């Protein structure tokens, strides 16, 4: 599929093509950043306006009952649960990924200390050095609180690090920097064989790749909804806990929405049964209502083959992108950080550029290349590396969302990349000024 005409022909035959019409995509834009922020579903603006004007404006406080606000976090969790291998009643949308990770990692550490510390105490939490920073910050904070050691490793070191002194393994199912995807079931089996609990971050996986939490026998999982789920900026995250663990402990943020009888207004805390205990304070109804429109697209996608169809197209999109970049952009210092193995690849492709390849030999030029692409209407993003002081290079990230990305978009994006590199327009000063958000 190396010509524009061939890509267009495949688009005409693509079973998932009707789902693109569910999104309000700007004209002239090739959007390859759904792994950072999903686009606006067409239904969202009107639905949120109705929530604001009718449910809030006219219904006022009655809408907690009449509009079903009170149980919306659980209903949305039930709606999305099958897409991550969860059962009804096991998922709730609430708070942020960072806050939810604090809850479940706290619970996992406590569970490990109380039930898995025999014959010797478990003193370590393991994570990848390239894990998303907020995960590492939360883990660092909790390790300090519990007098544990946070051990950061490279992916290839993982098997040797699963030892009986480890309490919890904290991993992202799909790595944000490379797109590498772990075999969740195998990693979980290996961890459990050593008595280690698993906490999975699904931010770059949920809605993009097959996830089977119960089938993998995972322990805890969190994830955001503003990427592949298209819930909007800052949309509520989700939390899942394996049913065998849910009712064992309070999570540490014991707010009134997690109380067994919140409107009894008792002075002592009694946690709700099940996943509802992982909620904390009053829930953001407008944001949750916007998220519902994003999840409705997934409900519609079930008519077209569900995750099996999405994954098939995702693999094809990323395959074509890699093939075209290597054919059409050779000789410009780009490397591939993302696995070629489709069973180890998420729904993104990450390209590297060597330190010293930038203007006047400073930096990699990757940031400026991405800015030049964005100026042309090809939107991806940039993630900074170690600046030559470590193993991680600067990254140009491109996300491929089967709900709306076309093969024609892939071809055109690579052609723009080729032109940016060949013309060296990325060297212009305006593309080398660093913005607050990269």
Over which residues does each language-model region extend?
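Pyridoxal 5′-phosphate
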Residues: 1-438
């Amino acid at each position: 599929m190396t010509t524009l005409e061939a890509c267009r022909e495949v688009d005409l035959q693509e079973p998932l093509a009707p789902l693109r019409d569910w999104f309000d995509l700007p004209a002239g834009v090739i959007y390859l950043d759904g792994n950072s922020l999903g686009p606006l579903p067409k239904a969202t603006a009107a639905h949120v306006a109705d929530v604001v004007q009718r449910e809030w404006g006219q219904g006022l406080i009655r809408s907690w009952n009449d509009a079903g606000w009170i149980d919306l976090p659980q209903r949305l969790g039930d709606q999305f649960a099958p897409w991550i291998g969860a059962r009804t009643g096991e998922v709730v949308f609430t708070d942020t990924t960072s806050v939810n990770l604090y809850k479940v990692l706290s619970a996992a550490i406590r569970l490990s200390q109380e039930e898995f510390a025999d014959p010797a105490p478990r003193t370590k939490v393991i994570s990848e050095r390239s894990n998303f920073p907020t995960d590492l910050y939360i883990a660092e904070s909790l390790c300090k609180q519990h007098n544990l050691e946070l051990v950061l490793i490279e992916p290839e070191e993982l098997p040797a690090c699963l030892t009986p002194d480890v309490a919890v393994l904290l991993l992202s199912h799909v790595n944000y920097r490379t797109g590498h995807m772990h075999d969740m079931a195998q990693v979980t089996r290996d961890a459990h064989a050593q008595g280690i609990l698993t906490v999975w971050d699904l931010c770059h996986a949920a809605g993009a790749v097959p996830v089977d939490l119960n089938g993998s026998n995972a322990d805890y999982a969190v994830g955001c909804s503003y990427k592949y789920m298209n819930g909007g900026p800052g949309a509520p995250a989700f939390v899942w806990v394996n049913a065998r663990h849910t009712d064992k402990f309070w999570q540490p943020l014991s707010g009134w929405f997690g109380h067994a009888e919140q409107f009894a207004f008792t002075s002592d805390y009694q946690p709700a049964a099940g996943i509802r205990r992982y909620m904390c304070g009053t829930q953001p109804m407008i944001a949750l209502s916007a998220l519902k429109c994003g999840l409705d697209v997934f409900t519609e996608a079930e008519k077209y083959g569900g995750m099996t169809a999405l994954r098939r197209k995702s693999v094809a999109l990323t395959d074509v992108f890699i093939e075209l970049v290597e054919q059409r952009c050779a000789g410009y210092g780009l490397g591939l950080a993302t696995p070629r193995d489709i069973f180890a690849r998420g729904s993104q492709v990450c390209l590297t550029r060597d330190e010293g390849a930038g203007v006047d030999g400073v930096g990699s030029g990757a940031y400026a290349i991405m800015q030049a692409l964005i100026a042309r209407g090809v939107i991806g993003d940039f993630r900074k590396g170690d600046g030559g002081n470590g193993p991680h290079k600067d990254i140009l990230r491109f996300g491929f969302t089967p709900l709306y990305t076309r093969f024609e978009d892939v071809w055109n994006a690579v052609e723009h990349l080729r032109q940016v590199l060949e013309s060296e327009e990325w060297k212009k000063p305006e593309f080398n000024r660093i913005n607050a958000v990269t």
